Every structure is written in structure tokens, then in C-alpha cells.
From Swiss-Prot:
It catalyses: D-erythro-1-(imidazol-4-yl)glycerol 3-phosphate = 3-(imidazol-4-yl)-2-oxopropyl phosphate + H2O. The keyword Cytoplasm applies. Its EC number is 4.2.1.19. One of its GO terms (molecular function) is imidazoleglycerol-phosphate dehydratase activity. CDD domains: IGPD. Belongs to the imidazoleglycerol-phosphate dehydratase family. This is Imidazoleglycerol-phosphate dehydratase. Coiled coil: none annotated. It is found in: Cytoplasm. It is an enzyme of class 4 (lyase). GO terms for cellular component: cytoplasm. Pathway: Amino-acid biosynthesis; L-histidine biosynthesis; L-histidine from 5-phospho-alpha-D-ribose 1-diphosphate: step 6/9. InterPro entries: IGPD_sf, ImidazoleglycerolP_deHydtase, ImidazoleglycerP_deHydtase_CS, Ribosomal_Su5_D2-typ_SF. The lineage of its organism: Bacteria, Pseudomonadati, Pseudomonadota, Betaproteobacteria, Burkholderiales.
């Protein structure tokens, strides 16, 4: 089982993330940011990753630090659970629709953090959630999971649907990229021999 637990405490947030990359999509998520909890649930369910996330942050200011730091801590946990990437498929991609919305997500566990983020949200907030924090979450995640991530919302006019298709597609692309290919044995999926 590829599992990891990360505890990250700062002056702004206190976060614990436990992951099982070979799970079934079970989750226990409490970040204090309800819309983020809903989106993290999509990652767990569609990625078949067991997630146990507890966060306490300075929500009296706003959700920025909490959302970003959950992304950072989740990225750290994914990187730790994946380990040296021996036998890893490395690449993953998914298209996910939800009614009128359609998003594409592509992942490379390259060891080189990079985010290409293309979502033109149709409104600034989804309930109380500032949609700008979606980018902050993924930027924190890719920086610490050491992945290249391309996110494209191809269409949609309902901002909730736009966000949900992105998180569902991320979960499905993650599931594909982090699978172990038994034909590779212990080989690292790079001509360099290291990622």
C-alpha cells in the first residue's frame, strides 16, 4: 500500500493529510471551507484515493491560507506516498463533462513542478468560495507533488459545474498517472533513470 501522512503547522494553518493511493475513494474531509471539502471529495471518489484531511486555519481573515496550504500538504503527501516512482505510469489525462461544462486535465509526474491553468470562471464566487483560490490550491499542490499539471476548462457557464469538472478530471487523471504498470517492474519511467 502506498500511504503517507503529513502534518504541516504554520502561524496561519494547522493541517493533517493522510492518503492511501491504492484506496477505494473513502474520505473524511474537514477543512472549514465547505466548497473545498466538496471538491476534495471529488478527487477521492474519482481518483480512488482514500483521503483523511483535517485543517484549521485563519478563516476569520479569509480562506486563502487554508485552501493554499491544503493544496501544499496534499501535494507533499502524494509525493511521499508515490516514492521513487518505480513502475509508475507517470502520465494521466481525463475529460469530464457535467451538463454544459467540460474540462480536460493532464498530469505528468515529471519531478518538475509546473501549472498551466486555463479556467475562465463565469462568476467570482461559488457561494462563499472565491474562485481565484482554485488556482492557489492547484499551484500549492503541483509545487509539492512535483508534477506538471495542465488544466483546461473547455466550456461551461455554471461556475460550480466548471470547478466540479476540473476536480473530477483531476481525480481521474491522477488515478491514471499514479497507477503502477506491472510490465515496467522497478523501472523509472524516464530515459534519465530518475524523476
Amino acid at each position: 500500500m502506498r500511504t503517507a501522512e503529513i502534518i504541516r503547522n504554520t502561524n496561519e494553518t494547522r493541517i493533517r493529510v493522510a492518503v492511501n493511493l491504492d484506496g477505494t475513494g473513502k474520505q473524511s474531509i474537514d477543512t472549514g471551507v465547505p466548497f473545498l471539502d466538496h471538491m476534495l471529495d471529488q478527487i477521492a471518489r474519482h481518483g480512488l484515493v482514500d483521503l483523511d484531511i483535517k485543517a484549521e486555519g485563519d478563516l476569520h481573515i479569509d480562506a486563502h491560507h487554508t485552501v493554499e496550504d491544503v493544496g501544499i500538504t496534499l501535494g507533499m503527501a502524494i509525493a511521499k506516498a508515490i516514492g521513487n516512482k518505480a513502475g509508475l505510469r507517470r502520465y494521466g489525462h481525463a475529460y469530464v463533462p457535467l451538463d454544459e461544462a467540460l474540462s480536460r486535465v493532464v498530469i505528468d509526474f515529471s519531478g518538475r513542478p509546473g501549472l498551466e491553468y486555463h479556467i475562465d470562471f463565469t462568476r467570482a464566487r461559488i457561494g462563499d468560495f472565491d474562485v481565484d483560490l482554485t488556482r492557489e490550491f492547484f499551484q500549492g499542490l503541483v509545487n509539492h507533488a512535483l508534477m506538471t499539471l495542465h488544466i483546461d476548462n473547455l466550456r461551461g457557464f455554471n461556475a460550480h459545474h466548471q470547478a466540479e469538472t476540473v476536480f473530477k478530471a483531476f481525480g481521474r487523471a491522477l488515478r491514471m498517472a499514479m497507477e503502477v504498470d506491472p510490465r515496467m517492474g522497478d523501472a523509472i519511467p524516464s530515459t534519465k533513470g530518475v524523476l
